[in-house]
């Protein structure tokens, strides 16, 4: 996937001041965003990085069905506190299946199916995301070493397979509530997410 840097601006947020940069696929028009702080000068050491896939329901509407919104906000706060880092915000709604299919999957979850089986019942993969654009985005930001903020081993493997130097993993466990506890357990038990024993 060939994406290109197309625009950047300063972005003040309630968590601090960031820079927002947009990358676009010139063929499809698909856009991805890097929200960064402290990268005006090329970093010489490892940088906090989170790969966050778009979640309209969690990020914008504060849905309690997932932990996406709390993860995004906690990462912004962490990066601001540290003074350096980047969130790669990928436009891959619903783990890559799109908003319509995600809501269809939610309806199946309302009937008792877990997040994996709901996708499979729609003849869709449990996780359809790609991460090839991340290397281009990180190269543009001159990030050479990564401390990846994630619980997802697939993201670790994906970045390593792309040749990105991931030197450490930073766990992120926030946002558990009665509505998403089973969802988080499913991510641990069926998607191998790296939660601690006492997270549930």
From Swiss-Prot:
It catalyses: GTP + 4 H2O = 2,5-diamino-6-hydroxy-4-(5-phosphoribosylamino)-pyrimidine + formate + 2 phosphate + 3 H(+). The gene is ribA. The keyword Metal-binding applies. HAMAP family: RibA. It comes from Acinetobacter baylyi (strain ATCC 33305 / BD413 / ADP1). NCBIfam families: PRK00393.1, ribA. The lineage of its organism: Bacteria, Pseudomonadati, Pseudomonadota, Gammaproteobacteria, Moraxellales. Pathway: Cofactor biosynthesis; riboflavin biosynthesis; 5-amino-6-(D-ribitylamino)uracil from GTP: step 1/4. The active site is at residues 127, 129. InterPro entries: GTP_cyclohydro_II, RibA, RibA-like_sf. GO terms for molecular function: GTP binding; GTP cyclohydrolase II activity; zinc ion binding. Zn(2+) binds at residues 55, 66, 68. This is GTP cyclohydrolase-2.
């Amino acid at each position: 996937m060939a994406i290109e840097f197309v625009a950047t601006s300063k972005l003040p947020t309630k968590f601090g001041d960031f820079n927002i940069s947009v990358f676009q696929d010139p063929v499809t028009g698909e856009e991805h965003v890097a929200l960064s702080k402290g990268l005006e000068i090329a970093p010489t050491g490892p940088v906090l990085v989170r790969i966050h896939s778009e979640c309209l329901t969690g990020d914008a509407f504060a849905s309690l069905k997932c932990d996406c919104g709390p993860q995004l906000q906690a990462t912004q706060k962490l990066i601001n506190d540290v003074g350096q880092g980047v969130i790669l915000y990928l436009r891959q709604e619903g783990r890559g299946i799109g908003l319509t299919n995600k809501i269809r999957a939610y309806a199946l979850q309302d009937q008792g199916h877990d997040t994996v089986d709901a996708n499979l019942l729609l003849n869709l993969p449990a996780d359809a995301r790609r991460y090839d654009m991340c290397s281009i985005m990180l190269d543009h930001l001159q990030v050479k070493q990564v401390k990846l903020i994630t619980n997802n081993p697939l993201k670790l493997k994906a970045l390593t397979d792309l040749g990105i130097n991931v030197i450490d993993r930073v766990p992120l466990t926030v946002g558990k509530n009665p509505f998403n506890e089973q969802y988080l357990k499913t991510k641990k038990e069926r998607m191998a997410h790296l939660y601690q024993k006492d997270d549930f």
